[in-house]
Amino acid sequence: MMRFRQVLQCGSVTALLALAAAVPAHAQVTRVDSGRQAIGFNLGYFNAKGLDSRVDEDVLLANLSQGQFSLAFDIDDFDGATFGGEWLIGLNDYLEAGVGVDFYQKTVPSVYDQKVRDDGREIAQDLKLRIVPLTGTIRFLPIGRHGVTPYVGAGIGAFNFRYSEVGEFIDNDGFTFTGRFIKSGWTAGPVVLGGVRFPIGDVFTVGGELRYQKAEGKGLLEEDFLGDKIDLGGWSTNFTFHLRF
């Protein structure tokens, strides 16, 4: 009988401790679930604008349209991976503001399409583009932020870019030389997006997002490029992960 009483007392103490631990844990879960801030990370793929939609005076178009001095590459070669992060703040149940930063960089090898060295070797270059967008967005959540959360949004981006061409080139007199042409700077443009988030437990969400950006870097003729602009626009398809708090 004494043994049973001791077991019962131990069981009661254990139950009370579990209940005491469960109360603040439940309160914390409730607080997190209703939290309106989130830190997010994304991993995706950037599709550069194609030949038919690139801005006039685009340097890539210029490189492809020099007749016998044209370079051989595809615009699609500039498609590549992106990654980034963002901070979201809920303004109410149906609106949230976000600030984020992303990173994209791609190096594309090219050669002269119709010109080679006297010994038959190709005349090669590396074309490299880097884009770092800093964005501010407002998003509309049509069914609220609880459970599965679809959203659409728009905003503005400040785009840091760097474009370079490094390798061997042919000058106006037909001589081959080694050169390096670089242009970097900042430009601004609109961003539109849409996506959906799915809850995982009480504090995490995963989802997908489609984003479009429109911007162009200018002043490339100052650095002796063949075109004065570099089109930075295109679509990004992203996998997203967020931690709510």
Model segments located where?
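Predominantly the C-terminal beta-signal and adjacent terminal strand-loop region
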Residues: 32, 106, 192, 197-245
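Cleavable N-terminal export/targeting peptides
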Residues: 1-35
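Short glycine/proline- and aromatic-enriched beta-strand/turn motifs that initiate or cap beta-hairpins
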Residues: 26-89, 236-245
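Repeated loop/turn-to-beta-strand initiation elements of outer-membrane beta-barrel proteins
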Residues: 94-97, 146-148, 202-206
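Helix-adjacent hinge/juxtasegments
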Residues: 125-128, 138-145
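Extracellular/periplasm-exposed beta-strand and loop segments of Gram-negative cell-envelope proteins
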Residues: 48-78, 103-133, 159-187, 215-236
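Residues on the lipid-exposed face of transmembrane beta-strands in outer-membrane beta-barrel proteins
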Residues: 41-43, 85-91, 101, 134-140, ...
